Amino acid sequence: MKNLIYSMIMLFTLSTIAQDGAEIWMSYELKAKDGMSQKFEAAAAKKTKKYNSTAENGIFTFNIMDGENQGMYSRVIGWKNWDFMNSNEDRSEELKYWRDNVDQYVDSSTGWKVWRRVKWASHNWTPETTFDYMLKHTRVIKPGMDQDVNHFLGRLQRVYEKHNYTGVVAVFRIMSGGNTNEYIICEGFNKYGELGEYPDTDKTEEELYNEMFGWESYRKDAKAYNLALEMYSRTTERQHFNAELSTQL
């Protein structure tokens, strides 16, 4: 009975998401065999040019620079919707090419994770957006504490938008393949130390936030946000965009 109830809840959740124009992303990580990174990259680059040359079949790759996954590659598919998930497109030739020409250089890989981009908490994240580097912040929400997290992230986005923040920020929440209380905040940039700025003011982000939402709002909302997160989940890693292993749009 518990399994049946859980299945019904998940079906209702996914059906609701399907109706609201969800923007779907997928990602996984892989590790090249020792001493085989160059051969892997050469083979993967050929595969990318052959099978992933358009926006419809595009894939993006990042080198993970630190943390427990240092040295691995993050492969990402984005800007999709439910039509992509429901597609019956035959990809057997592409998959066979990978098995025959690339997989021999791969030591291990994770399973796919499916994400939904949280548009109302994202800023300057468009198909035309490009950047060389990215900070990936992983967080896990305590059960039942979504409201405090959503409240703070949503208000921050409103500050970004109103005051023309130049940074690139995207928030993604797991839909499948992992803990559904997990989300990531991705910040794209082209130079370390320059994530973004508010060009029209000298005020701090906290001051702008308080102007919009009331005295001490930033401190109060940030405290509630932090208390809503699992302590073990607060990790950040650097990723560098790998153009050779990515679709050139």
Which role does the model predict for each range below?
Residues A18-L249:
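Short S/T/G/P-rich N-terminal loop/turn motif that feeds into the first structured element of a domain
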Residues M1-A22:
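Bacterial Sec-dependent N-terminal signal peptides
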